[in-house]
Amino acid sequence: NQVFVELIRQGYDTENTLFYYRSRNDKEVDFVTRKGVKVEKLIQVCYDLTSEKTRLREIDALIEVAGELKCQTLQIISYQHKETIEEKGFTIQVIPFMEWVNKPILVTPEIH
């Protein structure tokens, strides 16, 4: 999965900072990123959001897991679709993959 590879390239690792998550009600989120003990963001990957069934599945999973993990940064990485979704007090950014992958990475400088 290209999103997984990009997250690894950005410095996340599967031992400490990058996870898959399943909610208490079996809703799945593709990627949970962490900084220290704090959940940083939730990411769903969905090629096409035009099907209402798919759209609801992706949004419902993000919102449920956001509530469980107390996270406010929610993203859906899509093939081409871009929009901002406001749902149940949460804001979800839908970002085309090529736009997401080309965003600059903010690197915290090392202190010596």
Q: Could you describe each region identified by the protein language model?
A:
Residues 1-112:
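A cross-kingdom feature that marks ATP-driven nucleic-acid transaction machinery
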